[in-house]
Each structure stands twice: as C-alpha cells, then as structure tokens.
Swiss-Prot record:
InterPro entries assigned to the protein according to its UniProt record, in alphabetical order: Phosphatase_YcdX_put, PHP_phosphatase, Pol/His_phosphatase_N, Pol/histidinol_Pase-like
Organism field: Aeromonas salmonicida (strain A449)
Binding site for Zn(2+) 3: E74, H102, H132
Name recorded for this polypeptide: Probable phosphatase ASA_1316
Gene3D superfamilies noted in UniProt: Metal-dependent hydrolases
Length: 246
C-alpha cells in the first residue's frame, strides 16, 4: 500500500534538525507525499523554538504545488498529570498536537509513572496522537495505554526512525503496540520523524510491522490525507477546506 501522509517532521526551528519547510516540498512531490505535518519540538526542549513559532504558523500556505502542510507541534509530556508544554489559549492556532516523552523534559523513571503520564495526556483531550510510544527508555503498560488511546480516540505513532537510529531497541515494543492496537481498535499514524528532508515519507519499518500483524488499513491514518483529516475533525479539530482536493 502507498502511504501519502507523514505526521512527524522537524525543521531548522528545532536546531538539531537541518531542513526548512521549503526543503521538504520537492521531496514530498517526488515521493508522492500529499500531506505532511510540521511538528517542531515543544518549547520546554532546550533547542526548541519559542511558542511564538507555533502561534505564527498561520503564515504558511496551506498547499504548495499540490502538497498540503499541516501546522503542528511535537509537544512534551511534562509530568505524571499528562500536562504538555503548549498554552491552551493558543491551541486553536494548530491543526494537530502530537505529544511524547523526551528525556530533557521528563527524565525516565518507572513503568507505572510513564504509563499514568501517557494515559493522562491521552485523557486530557488536548493530544491527537502520541509520538514514539514504543521508546524503550520509557517502558509503559502497553495494554493499558492502547486501551486508553482506543477509548479516547487518540492515535499512536509508529515512528520509523525509532528502528534505525533514534531509539534502539524499540522494535519489540512497537510490534506489541501494533498488535494491541489491532485487537483493541486503536488508530495508528506513521511518522518519519525527519530531522532532515531526505527521510520524509520513509515508512519502511512501519509498513513491515503493520503487514506482519495484519493491521486493518482503515485504521492507518497515513493511508490518505482524507483519513487523517477526518480523524482530526472527529476529535474536534477545524475543517480545512484548502485540503479538499489533496
């Protein structure tokens, strides 16, 4: 199956990344990516952009040469209460919010704390998807998290970079998440987690896992712009008419 949506990319606004949004566009066109989200790190990361960066994303065109650009953030889950590092009052400026654990903001501790923090973020209503939940540095009760994600209609990310260089040891956890999501009715999203444009739309490992698990295609948000946009609208995000023809 051809996947045409990438929900996790970073730009030079996160200074450990190396591409601009403009850099992503020709690669998106060449690879058949119809829609991608720009999701720079939330402000509590040391090298993240100021929250004004996210507030000002409205200056971006919706569609450039047939490629749609979603305005997003990879926020940080800050504590066991599931709070994230983006002001509620500006949330409407974004099309989607992804959130996850990052060591500089939430130091790894124990499975029970990680699990409760992630479930509380899911329950908060603010988070549309959870980034790299299979990170072995943050062990979780997979069944409990996936059950909450299914109940609250929050997508779980398969992060392709976790299998190659970012989070070694993720594969078994991600496989278990896919199987639990299949059985419990949760949605999956695919993220390249590109920190340079050359990896946009690389879902090699994501595709392999969902194929091996016989995961239902209709719960994979990367399959089409409409699949992702319908999911976000079902969560109360605004309809974006400019994306009608993607």
């Amino acid at each position: 199956m051809k996947y045409t949506v990438d929900t996790h990319t970073h730009t030079v606004a996160s200074t450990h990344a190396y591409s601009t949004i403009h850099d992503y566009l020709p690669i998106a066109r060449a690879r058949g990516i119809k829609l991608f989200a720009t999701t720079d790190h939330g402000p509590d990361m040391a090298d993240a952009p100021h929250f004004w960066h996210f507030v000002n994303l409205h200056v971006l065109p919706r569609v450039v040469d047939g490629v749609g650009i979603l305005r997003g953030i990879e926020a940080n889950i800050k504590n066991i209460d599931g709070e994230i590092d983006f002001p509620v009052r500006y949330e409407s400026r974004l099309d989607m919010i992804m959130a996850g654990f990052h060591e500089p903001v939430f130091p790894p501790c124990d499975q029970a704390t990680h699990t409760q923090a992630m479930i509380n973020a899911i329950r908060s209503g603010r988070v549309d998807m959870i980034s790299h939940p299979g990170n072995p540095a943050f062990p979780i009760d997979i069944q409990a998290v996936v059950k909450a994600a299914a109940q609250y209609r929050v997508a779980l990310e398969l992060n392709n970079s976790s299998f190659s260089h970012s989070r070694p040891g993720s594969e078994n956890n991600c496989g278990a998440i896919v199987e639990a999501a299949r059985d419990l009715g949760a949605y999956l999203t695919f993220g390249s987690d590109s920190h340079v444009a050359f990896s946009l739309g690389n879902f090699e490992h994501c595709h392999r896992l969902v194929t091996e698990a016989h995961f239902p295609e209709d719960r994979i948000l990367a399959r089409s712009p409409r699949a992702l946009l319908d999911f976000l609208e079902s969560r109360g995000r605004a309809h974006i008419p400019e994306f009608a023809d993607l």
